[in-house]
Curated annotation (Swiss-Prot):
A motif ('KMSKS' region) lies at residues 198-202. Keywords: Aminoacyl-tRNA synthetase, ATP-binding, Cytoplasm, Ligase, Nucleotide-binding, Protein biosynthesis. This is Tryptophan--tRNA ligase. One of its GO terms (biological process) is tryptophanyl-tRNA aminoacylation. Homodimer. Signal peptide: none annotated. It comes from Borreliella burgdorferi (strain ATCC 35210 / DSM 4680 / CIP 102532 / B31) (Borrelia burgdorferi). ATP binds at R11, P12, T13, G19, H20, G151, R152, D153, L190, K198, M199, S200, K201, S202. One of its GO terms (cellular component) is cytosol. SUPFAM superfamilies: Nucleotidylyl transferase. It is an enzyme of class 6 (ligase). The keyword rRNA processing does not apply. The keyword Aminoacyl-tRNA synthetase applies. It catalyses: tRNA(Trp) + L-tryptophan + ATP = L-tryptophyl-tRNA(Trp) + AMP + diphosphate + H(+).
Amino acid sequence: MKRKVMLTGDRPTGALHLGHYVGSVVNRLKFQEEYETYFIIADLHTLTTKPDLKSINTIPSNVREMVLDYLACGINPDKVSIYLQSAIPELFELHLIFSMIVTVARLQRIPSIKDMSIAAGLKEIPYGLLGYPVLMSADILMTKANLVPVGRDNESHIEFARELARRFNHLYKNNFFPIPESVFTDSRPLVGIYGKNKMSKSLDNAIFLNDDENLLEKKIMSMYTDPNRIRADIPGNVEGNPIFIYHSFFNSNHEEVEDLKSRYKKGKVGDVEVKKKLFLALNSFLKPIRDKRSFYEAKKKDYIDEIIFDGTSKARFIANKVVKDVKDLIGLSKTWNGIKYSAEKKLKNEE
């Protein structure tokens, strides 16, 4: 039986951190075993909020760093097609065709667009950002994805893609595009090391998967804990405490975690001990990832590029067929095909 197609991916922001691992990578390791999986490196989406040259110039190195971390975590390029969004020109065509059957009013009702604009510090919403859901729908429908992993706060984007697929199918009287389904990961964003905000490279509150032991220890020892606990003998709060959130995710010794929580709530253990044990647990978790990353870094220089090239070539082959079929279906191919046929026939007769 043919496996279902899944599309997932990231903007190329560089090396991955623990928030990425908890939020997406851990699920992707399962997905690659169950589905025909595509990873999109969404560099075009980067332009919707960061179209400046400085940001664009970071994309090549960010792409390679991100793919290195994919491999280090166990993503298998033999099971997953990793492709570069901007290298699929057919995607631009599909995006344009879709934009003709979408209203501005519908796009303005998507709440995340305004949120993205505010987060990027934009005074006005540019056309590209307003049309972000159309491009995302083109990403999804280009691969004829059946499944798309998504957090519940971004489900409106997948609902829009479903809407667009249904509208296209209805307008052109054909069930050409499958209706994509959301796969909810149910993972909350991992809080950054200073509390409050989620882990983010831009907020400088992240622990990266490739942080070495010294840097990892330095970051953990500086972590935010319970602000009301000024001495070790004062009972502390473990709920919402970043130290214990990290212990729950990354410390495989569950008995130790429960013991630390119990003593912390009674004021019988200090922050230093709790942090040191977190460092040992997290370093043990990250060491195989760092080692695997070093292994791939030591390979020939263009190894990562070959993986991206192969994945992009496969994605483009699929995209080319989809766009050709779409043009045939809506009748857009007729004019050019007629002109081409007449011209080629004339040339052949003249030979």
